Amino acid sequence: MFSAAISVFVLATLTAATPMARGIVPAPPAGQCNVGTQQCCNTVQDASSDPAAGILALLGINVQDVTGQVGLTCNPITVIGGVNSNCDASPVCCENNSFGSLISLGCVPVSL
């Protein structure tokens, strides 16, 4: 019994001590997303496309730093039955939605 308790303690300690990069949030796997990060975007493009690259440049974001696709003119998808619960454009899950509805970064498609 004592050795099992020690094993659990050691495993928990090693898990907590695993190094992780600060400030980097990994993108969710394609098709999986938290409800709070789902967006309905009018268009979804590569970061290097002319419209996306232009907006990224205005925001001071290097195109090479963007992983995944970029959503333009996005609105959050709310809970089922809410005002914004359906999406007639491109439903995506994005890493970074901190630029209002203008642009969302690190987007992957999701199924609603």
Swiss-Prot record:
GO terms for cellular component: extracellular region; fungal-type cell wall. Residues 1-17 form the signal peptide. Its main location: secreted. Keywords: Cell wall, Disulfide bond, Glycoprotein, Secreted, Signal. CDD domains: hydrophobin_I. Induction: A CT-rich motif, which is often found immediately upstream of the transcription start point of highly expressed filamentous fungal genes, is present at the expected position. One additional CT-rich region is also found upstream of the TATA box in the promoter region. The keyword Secreted applies. It comes from the Eukaryota. Pfam families: Hydrophobin. The keyword Glycoprotein applies. It is found in: Secreted; Secreted, Cell wall. Disulfide bonds join 33-93, 40-87, 41-74, 94-107. Glycans are attached at residue 96. GO terms for molecular function: structural constituent of cell wall. InterPro entries: Hydrophobin. Belongs to the fungal hydrophobin family. Aerial growth, conidiation, and dispersal of filamentous fungi in the environment rely upon a capability of their secreting small amphipathic proteins called hydrophobins (HPBs) with low sequence identity. Class I can self-assemble into an outermost layer of rodlet bundles on aerial cell surfaces, conferring cellular hydrophobicity that supports fungal growth, development and dispersal; whereas Class II form highly ordered films at water-air interfaces through intermolecular interactions but contribute nothing to the rodlet structure. Self-assembles to form functional amyloid fibrils called rodlets. Self-assembly into fibrillar rodlets occurs spontaneously at hydrophobic:hydrophilic interfaces and the rodlets further associate laterally to form amphipathic monolayers. This is Class I hydrophobin 6. The gene is Hyd-6.
